[in-house]
C-alpha cells in the first residue's frame, strides 16, 4: 500500500522469509522490476509470488523443449532459417536483446526486467512454443529439425539475457540443458558485435583523465525479418482479437463459429491457408472462408488493416447477451460514481492516507477500462442485430 516499513507498525517484510517461500531469484527479479528511477518500491508478497510463477514458466518451457528433442545443432545460424516461424523468433529475440541491452546501459533495470518478462512469457512460451507444437509433433523433417534448433537457440539467448536478474535458475538451466564449455556467468552477451577497432578519446584539457572507450553497438541487422514479423504478428493479433471478442460476448469455448476474411489479398489468403489448422485450434473456429463483403449479422475485427468478419446470428442469444451487457454497464457506472463521490469529498482527500487515495484512483481506472470494453461489446452486438 505504499506505507514505509517500520518495526513499530509491524509491517516489515523479512527478505529471508521471502527467499524461503519463493526463492532468491524471484525476490531479485521483483526488486529489479519495481526499481524505477525516482520512485519508491511498493513491495508485496503477491508480486514476489508472481515472479516465482514466471520462473516456473521458464523451467516448464525448458522441460518442454527437452522432451521434444530441442537441441542446438552445431553451426546453426538462426539468420538462415527457412521456416517463417523460426525467422520470426530470431527477429523478436534480436529486438528483445537490443531493448534489454539499451535499458541496462541506461540503468533502467525495471524496463529491462519488464521486457524480459513479456518476451519470455508472451512471445516465447505463449506463442512461439504453442505455434511450433504441430511441427514438433509431426514426422521428422528438415522443418522439424530447424524448429528444434531454433527453440534451443532462443532458450539459450533468454538464459543469457535473464542471468543478471535470475542468476541461480538460469545457471542451473544452462548446465542441465546441454553440454557447455563453461558457466553461464562467463558466456558472451547475446548477439555480440563483430570484432571492430575501438576508438579511444582523451578528455580535452586533462592529461590525467582516463581515456573513454567507445564500443560499437551490437550488430543485429542480420536477424531482422519484417516479412516474418508481418505474417506471425498478423496471426497472433487475429487470434488474440477473436479470443477477446469471444470473452467480451460471453461465448463458450466449446462453441465454434466461422471466420470470413473480407477483401483478402493474395498474401492474406496464403497466410490463412498456411495457418488454418492453427487458427482453428487456438481461436476455436469452424470454417475459414473469403468474401468481398462482410456477411449480414457479423462482428467485424480490424487486424493490421485487414477485416475479419465473424457471423454470430444463431450462435448466441442476442437479446439475452444485451441484457447481460446492460447489467454489467450499470455496475461499472455505479462503481465509477461511487469512487468519484469519495474523491470529490475534500474532507476525505485531505484526511485519507496517500495509499488509500491511490487505491481509489486505481479502482476508478479499472472500472473505466471495464466500461470501455462493455461499450465496445454493445457496439459489436448492434452490428450483429
Language model region names:
Residues 1-83, 178-184, 248-257, 266, ...:
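Catalytic adenosine-cofactor/nucleotide-binding cores of aminoacyl-tRNA synthetases and other
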Residues 26-34, 62-65, 116-120, 128, ...:
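Short alpha-helical scaffolding segments that buttress acidic/His motifs in well-ordered protein cores
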Residues 32, 71-98, 129-240, 263:
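Acidic, turn-prone loop/beta-hairpin segments
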Residues 49, 178-385:
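C-terminal low-complexity, glycine/proline- and small-hydrophobic-enriched intrinsically disordered tails
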Residues 53-66, 86-96, 114-135, 300-305, ...:
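Core structural elements
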Residues 55, 93, 97, 116-121, ...:
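Short amphipathic alpha-helical coiled-coil/interface segments
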Residues 104-111:
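Short helix-adjacent coil turns
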Amino acid at each position: 500500500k505504499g506505507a514505509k516499513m517500520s518495526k513499530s507498525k509491524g509491517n516489515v517484510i523479512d527478505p529471508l522469509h521471502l527467499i524461503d517461500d519463493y526463492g532468491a531469484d524471484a525476490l531479485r527479479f521483483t526488486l529489479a522490476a519495481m526499481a524505477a528511477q525516482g520512485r519508491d518500491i511498493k513491495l508485496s508478497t503477491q508480486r514476489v509470488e508472481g515472479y516465482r510463477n514466471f520462473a516456473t514458466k521458464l523451467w516448464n518451457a525448458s522441460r518442454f523443449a527437452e522432451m521434444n528433442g530441442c537441441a542446438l545443432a552445431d553451426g546453426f545460424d538462426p539468420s538462415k532459417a527457412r521456416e517463417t516461424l523460426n525467422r520470426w523468433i530470431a527477429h523478436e529475440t534480436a529486438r528483445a536483446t537490443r531493448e534489454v541491452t539499451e535499458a541496462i546501459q541506461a540503468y533502467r533495470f525495471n524496463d529491462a526486467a519488464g521486457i524480459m518478462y513479456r518476451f519470455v512469457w508472451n512471445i516465447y512460451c505463449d506463442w512461439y512454443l504453442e505455434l511450433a507444437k504441430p511441427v514438433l509433433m509431426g514426422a521428422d523433417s528438415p522443418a522439424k529439425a530447424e524448429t528444434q534448433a531454433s527453440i534451443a537457440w532462443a532458450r539459450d539467448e533468454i538464459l543469457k539475457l535473464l542471468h543478471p536478474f535470475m542468476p541461480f535458475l538460469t545457471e542451473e538451466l544452462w548446465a542441465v540443458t546441454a553440454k557447455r564449455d563453461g558457466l553461464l556467468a562467463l558466456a558472451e552477451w547475446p548477439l555480440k558485435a563483430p570484432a571492430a577497432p575501438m576508438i579511444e578519446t582523451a578528455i580535452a584539457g586533462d592529461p590525467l583523465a582516463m581515456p573513454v572507450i567507445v564500443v560499437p553497438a551490437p550488430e543485429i541487422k542480420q536477424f531482422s525479418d519484417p516479412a516474418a514479423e508481418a505474417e506471425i504478428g498478423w496471426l497472433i493479433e487475429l487470434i488474440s482479437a477473436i479470443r477477446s471478442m469471444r470473452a467480451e460476448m460471453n461465448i463458450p469455448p466449446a462453441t465454434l463459429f466461422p471466420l470470413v476474411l473480407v477483401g483478402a489479398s493474395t498474401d492474406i489468403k496464403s497466410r490463412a491457408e498456411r495457418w488454418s489448422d492453427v487458427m482453428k485450434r487456438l481461436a476455436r473456429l469452424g470454417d475459414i472462408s473469403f468474401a468481398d463483403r462482410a456477411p449480414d449479422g457479423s462482428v467485424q475485427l480490424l487486424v493490421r488493416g485487414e477485416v475479419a468478419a465473424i457471423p454470430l446470428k444463431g450462435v448466441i442469444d442476442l437479446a439475452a447477451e444485451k441484457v447481460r451487457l446492460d447489467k454489467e454497464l450499470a455496475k461499472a457506472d455505479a462503481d465509477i460514481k461511487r469512487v468519484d463521490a469519495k474523491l470529490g469529498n475534500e474532507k476525505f482527500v485531505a484526511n485519507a492516507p496517500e495509499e488509500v487515495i491511490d487505491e481509489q484512483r486505481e479502482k476508478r481506472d479499472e472500472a473505466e477500462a471495464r466500461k470501455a470494453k462493455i461499450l465496445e461489446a454493445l457496439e459489436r452486438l448492434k452490428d450483429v442485430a
